[in-house]
A protein has these predicted regions:
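Rossmann-fold dinucleotide-binding core
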Residues: 82-87, 100, 106-218, 226-251, ...
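Interdomain hinge/lid region at the active-site interface
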Residues: 182, 207, 212, 219, ...
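NAD(P)+-binding Rossmann beta1-loop-alpha1 motif at the extreme N-terminus of oxidoreductases
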Residues: 1-64, 70, 96, 133-136
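Small-residue-rich helix-loop
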Residues: 223, 348-381
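Glycine-rich, highly charged phosphate/nucleotide-binding loops
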Residues: 54-61, 78-86
Length: 479
């Protein structure tokens, strides 16, 4: 087979198929391959008019169809399936060729694969892709890792197929070496979990405390989407809440089983944050909320537990409460992104990636699930101060939270009185209050640790590490 294709895509499920079409629509000749050849030929037959495809049935045909240096995109399930594809194709490649993994791989696997393939002279580019099947087709946010050399070759193609922000900037940048791209995509998904949880809590408050119907709440979200909460997730929330089930005539949200599933990237975000010592409490609560929702038997057994008598607000009070919920949602959102960017910064430092946080926020402005007008503000904050220790240290965000905090607290009081669970809002406020506190009970915790385990402590008034002889005369000794 002649060498004709500028890029190849193997793994033609929805994401792979749409990504291949995106490349073809943008003028590239695309070699396509799938484990089952029928899917390959079906793609070319159905979408061949969109651009130039080269259908291949075997690994050798696929590799032979690619121009040198070869660019091979893997779009298969993370884990063992990805390793299996690499084992199949790597022996057919030459030094200078590159394998691009566009799946949701764990960044540690990406680091391993990059190291192993580098020894063969093959570039491995772990690439986070966000936007779902629509984004893959029409322009996703793309987070490539790997070497700078590989990005010099691949970058122009990714820039062409990526989403474009409002200022027409492509939503792609070289994030950092080896696993940086998949690490940033992981944290993106963690923030997505937190965003969705906060939106869900806002919905529950508007329904159970304010007494609004799903259709009325949809209108409230549409109004919010014209302001500072303008985002893809707020937009689709209004669409979901306004949808009516054709079979029953009930609001769609009332006929969906209230058990939220998850694929694992949110859980990874929390696990890695624990390893790095980074508090991502909002993301953690979002993950735990999904887990709790799935324990149907436990929830059924607990429905008879005592709780407050719920009394929805009157119509005149409901509108004011909705405004307070908007404040609480926005303030909590700031905290969620603060925690997410803290984890990215910590990962960058731990693994030597030198990630530009402003650039990350810039490529999340379009194409991805968490795209929001709010990200322009984050980019501006990091561009002005690349060493910004926290988004809460930015003057603008600090002022906005200061203006929102009274309403934020009132919303949580109302939720507690009515028995509405708001773990995301509560975790965000607790994080904010902990950061601004003059003293934390951690001093007592450290004293307890010293008492039962001789774990020592540091003093506020002099340097050194100390231990109290709790079982003796309680004198203090230098550790």
């Amino acid at each position: 087979m002649s060498t004709t294709a500028q890029i190849g895509v193997t793994g033609l499920a929805v994401m792979g198929r749409n990504l291949a079409r995106n490349f073809a629509r943008n003028g590239y000749t695309v070699a396509v391959h799938n484990r089952t050849a029928s899917r390959t030929h079906a793609l070319v037959e159905e979408f061949g008019g969109e651009g130039d495809f080269v259908a291949t049935e075997t690994a050798k045909e696929f590799v032979a169809a690619l121009e040198r240096p070869r660019r091979l995109v893997i779009m298969v399930k993370a884990g063992d399936p990805t390793d299996a594809v690499i084992r199949e194709f790597a022996p057919l490649l030459e030094p200078g060729d590159m394998i691009i993994d566009g799946g949701n791989a764990h960044f540690a696997d990406t680091r391993r694969r990059e190291r192993e393939l580098r020894e063969q002279g093959i570039h491995f580019v772990g690439t986070g892709i966000s936007g779902g099947e629509e984004g893959a087709l029409n322009g996703p946010s793309i987070m490539p890792g790997g070497s700078k050399e590989s990005y010099a070759s691949l970058g122009p193609m990714l820039e062409k197929i990526s989403a474009k922000a409002a200022d027409e900037a492509p939503c792609v940048t070289h994030v950092g070496a080896d696993g940086a791209g998949h690490f940033v995509k992981m944290v993106h998904n963690g923030i997505e979990y937190a965003d969705m949880q906060l939106i869900g809590e806002a919905y529950q408050l508007l329904r159970d405390v304010a007494g609004y119907t799903p259709a009325q709440i949809a209108d409230i979200f549409r109004t919010w989407n014209t302001g500072r909460l303008d985002s893809y997730l707020i937009e689709i929330t209004a669409e979901v809440l306004s949808h009516v089930d054709a079979e029953t005539g009930k609001p769609f949200v009332d006929v969906v089983v209230d058990q939220a599933e998850q694929k694992g990237t949110g859980r990874w975000t929390v696990q890695i944050a624990l390893d790095l010592g980074v508090p991502v409490s909002g993301i953690a609560e979002a993950v735990f909320a999904r887990s709790l929702s799935g324990h149907a038997a436990l929830r059924d057994a607990s429905r008879g537990l005592a709780g407050p008598t719920a009394t929805p607000l009157g119509e005149s009070e409901a509108a004011a409460f909705a405004d307070r919920v908007e404040q609480a949602l926005y303030a909590s959102k700031i905290v969620s992104y603060t925690q997410g960017f803290h984890e990215v910064a910590a990962g960058s430092e731990e693994y030597g990636w030198d990630i530009d946080l402003g650039a990350v926020s810039a490529i999340w402005r379009g194409g991805c699930i968490i795209r929001a007008a709010f990200l322009d503000r984050i980019r501006a904050a990091y561009d002005a101060r690349p060493d910004l220790p926290s988004l809460l240290s930015d003057e603008t965000f600090a002022q906005e939270i200061a203006a929102a905090q009274d309403d934020w607290r009132e919303v949580l009081i109302a939720a507690t009185r009515q028995g509405v669970p708001t773990p995301g809002f509560a975790a965000a406020l607790a994080y904010y209050d902990a950061l601004r506190a003059e003293r934390l009970p951690a001093a007592l915790t450290q004293g307890q640790r010293d008492y039962f385990g001789a774990h020592t402590y540091r003093r506020t008034d002099r340097d050194g590490t100390f231990h109290t002889l709790w079982g003796g005369d309680r004198s203090e000794v230098t550790a």
